Amino acid sequence: MFVSATLPAALVAGVLASPAAAALSARQDPCTALGAGASSSLTYTFQLEVANASATDSAASGTLALMNGSSDGLWWLKEIQQNSTGTFSGWTLQSGALIPTPSSNDSGLVGSDMPVPLGSIIQFAVTNNGSANAGAGQTPYCAVSDAGGQAALAVNGDANSFAVCQAPSLDWVLVYAASSDNNGTYTFDTCEQHYIYLTQA
């Protein structure tokens, strides 16, 4: 009796530990739940462009650049109005990781995306030792197609909750699900909802 009761448990454990089960779970893409055309990877390098959600067209109003922004060494996505993109010249999306591409003269830097809680500024850890941050990749980013066929950025399964808000430094920073409860990192009354487009560089 004991043998027959343990056999099904052993079979289940064996199946779950098999390479086929591991491959199946590795192939599951969390972005597919967002509908047809959603993906956790793109084959091209792109710029992050912002478009005001209340505008009648989807024309970009600015570009986001990764800039050193906080006293704890984390870098923020900030809206810029000039052609320069700063230390990082573009972006890639690989298996849900949003990866900044260093400009050629700053090739030693590595940027790693960080978890994105509600009400927070979008942050990245940037190191100059060539190693990624251990906390990276915990929040999957996705590319989703909007009604016009443009690739838009989504995080936490949501492409509609990005906002550009003014920080105390007077920089305009990218925020996810802006909230008045933000410990003074940005001024909530300045926030405007934006879509983030992944425009091929």
Predicted feature residues:
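N-terminal, post-signal-peptide region of Sec/Tat-exported proteins
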Residues: A60-S84
